[in-house]
Amino acid sequence: MGVLWDDSILEYICLSNYRESHMVRLGDTVPNFTQASTYGDIDFYEWAGDSWVVLFSHPADFTPVCTTELGTVAKLKPEFDKRNVKAIALSVDNVESHKGWVGDIEETQSTTLNYPILADADRKVSDLYDMIHPNANAAVTVRSVFVIDPNKKLRLTFTYPPSTGRNFDELLRVIDSLQLTDNYSVATPADWKDGEDVVIVPSLKDPEVLKQKFPKGYEEVKPYLRLTPQPNK
């Protein structure tokens, strides 16, 4: 006798399969969208242009952790600009709510909000980017971060619990690593910071090529672990 499935189980399986097939993974081209924001309607691809993008969601407007996060991102604009990065925030609140909250952010965080907040009231973007946990409140986006490169490829995702604010210094560190390793045959070791030694990718073995690519030389700790000064410094 076959297994009998009730409607709730079938619905769960269908939803799980749908979510799995629509998840955006590292290296994927992220989907485009048009959505309302505090800066008017935004066509994401057009707005992003040739920049890197930090797209980050927050659970709700007028909440304490999110207020500090959006203020921090505004203060970091000079650092984002140096790296050719645009920031854009998102929650499922409407534009009027966002605009009311902006005043609180600017007052309490002593800054000017200098980037758009997407008003994803219809959950269009949240669903595209899988920002709503299946077992959580459907009206609350998780605290996610997406780093997207100029080719519209997803390069990094972070997901934080609602109780924990994001570490934006770590976000800048990872962007530094991505931009460096896109242009040089290196990787960045644990706890690396801009200006510190990096490691040569193991696939490079030809001594002449190594000499050409790394004129400052390198230290071979193991054949697969070779340290060299950061090449763009």
Say what each PLM segment does.
Residues 5, 12-233:
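Chalcogenol-based redox active-site neighborhoods
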